[in-house]
A protein has these predicted regions:
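A short glycine-rich, His/Asp/Glu-containing loop-to-beta-strand
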Residues: 55-73
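N-terminal leader segment of winged-helix/HTH proteins
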Residues: 44-57
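Catalytic core of Fe(II)/2-oxoglutarate
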Residues: 116-178
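N-terminal auxiliary "cap/dimerization" subdomain that precedes the catalytic jelly-roll/cupin core
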Residues: 1-47, 159, 167, 171-178
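Secondary-structure boundary elements
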Residues: 56-59, 96-101, 157, 172-174
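Short, well-ordered beta-strand micro-motif
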Residues: 8, 68, 94, 145-147, ...
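Residues that flank catalytic or metal-binding motifs in active/ligand-binding sites
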Residues: 62, 87-89, 99, 161-165
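Catalytic core of non-heme Fe(II) oxygenases with the double-stranded beta-helix
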Residues: 69-143
Length: 178
């Protein structure tokens, strides 16, 4: 089974442009791998069609974050969560230059340490990647529900900045997966 699933979001081009405007108001330094949480109220005000989609699909907002990856940069192999509570799913929305970057899932890796990463917005487990085996990859060109409990990384191997909007929900959205 693939660790991702395409999700059809009505009026996504409109939502994408509204989120890009919000991104410019939220993140000011694009020179390093950066993330910034935004509030439900702000997204509700600026992106009402996205909130309509969430409501129509019984998705209860937990956190929404912008993730920016500079050119020729990435994020190391990790899983989202910690030893007490792991995240399972993230709804990732492509915003800018996602066509030539990849989210990659891995096998044969083990947790090295759990870290609280304020800059990444949650606890993550850094993985030992010496014997890693790639099991899947995705160029995020449309909205996808992705597994974040499986070791994964991001590679932006292009000369352009990559930006996405990533949402987490309580409870986890199993009903969108199955």
């Amino acid at each position: 089974m693939r660790p991702y699933k395409a999700i059809d979001i009505p009026d996504f081009p409109l939502i994408q442009s509204q989120l890009l405007e919000l991104l410019d108001q939220t993140i000011t330094d694009f020179s390093y791998t950066n993330t910034k949480a935004t509030t439900y109220e702000l997204v509700k005000d600026k992106c009402p069609r996205l909130i309509e989609f969430l409501d129509a699909n019984d998705l209860v907002w937990d956190v929404g974050r912008f993730f920016v990856t500079p050119p020729r940069d990435g994020l190391y192999i990790h899983v989202d969560g910690n030893s007490e509570r792991s995240r399972i799913f993230s709804l990732n929305l492509p915003l800018l230059n996602c066509e030539q970057s990849e989210m990659i899932w891995w096998d044969n890796v083990e947790v090295v340490e759990y870290r609280s990463h304020e800059s990444y917005g949650n606890n993550i487990a850094k993985m030992d990647s010496e014997n890693k085996i790639q099991i899947a990859s995705l160029a995020l060109t449309t909205p996808h529900l992705v597994r974040v409990d499986i070791p994964h990384s991001v590679e932006n191997n292009q000369d352009n900045l990559r930006a996405i909007f990533s949402m987490r929900f309580k409870p986890e959205p199993y009903h969108l997966w199955y």
